[in-house]
């Protein structure tokens, strides 16, 4: 299921948009389980013709998937100050922890 159309992005099918929603439809929940998306999406970056010749980094920090290292329990255990350091913190803990639990069901 692609969110990329001939005229732009269909936000109703955009994984990044869906992961940021507080209330998801059963279809959106199923899509997140199927794709394993927890927060955001890099598909647009990967298919963009402007990025076709981009060099890959050897810096481990950028090569590893940060989301793969997260667990709902680790996020819940963070202090408010530590949680605030993450880009997704503006959305609140519940959205990200629910997404993680949904993917791991």
Language-model region placement:
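Flexible internal linker/loop segments at domain or repeat junctions
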Residues: 68-87
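Conserved aromatic-histidine-acidic binding/catalytic patches
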Residues: 36, 88
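Iron-sulfur cluster-binding cysteine motifs and their immediate structural context
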Residues: 1-16, 37-39, 43-62
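Active-site-proximal loop/short-helix segments
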Residues: 3-27, 65-73
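Long, compositionally biased charged/polar accessory segments in the mid-to-C-terminal portions
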Residues: 81, 89-105
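Short linker/helix segments within small regulatory modules
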Residues: 26-34
